[in-house]
Amino acid sequence: RSGALPAPVPAHARKRPVESDESDGSLDACVLAKELGYTGVSSKACKGVYRSILNRARCAHWNGRAGEERYFMSAEDLIVQAGVSLQQDLSLATIIGCTHGERNGHHYVNGLAGAPREEQTRVLNAYPNLYRRGDDGIVRLSIRGGTIALGDLATIGFGSRAEI
């Protein structure tokens, strides 16, 4: 984080979209990154919902001034656990208009394996398109053809309608 932002993006790299990603360590990091030639910033729910919304507004404002869609946001989850935190992270990505996202948590965490079976069933019943039960009985994020169905999250409660 400390090594990336002090240096400007080299001229040859400015021909492509370059994202500040891990350097987004403060509320003004996105502004500093833009001044250094970065055109993108990542949204991570763990860094705060309001920061993502603020950065999305910044990108929209800068794009309006530039007259083109130059500035962008990506959605990343680091290691978000299945359940409410994943659902809210996906909801945030949708709110700020990210149609593609990097999902890592499902590679490192075994879905809802740590939750009692009854809780897993309640989550699966509340979000039947977002999760699936594996052959081993564990409820996990359902990824089909590289996509995640988000329709179950279009509900009151910022992605958390299940009684857990």
PLM regions: where:
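Catalytic core of soluble alpha/beta enzymes
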Residues: R1-A75, V84
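Flexible C-terminal active-site loop/helix
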Residues: R65-I164
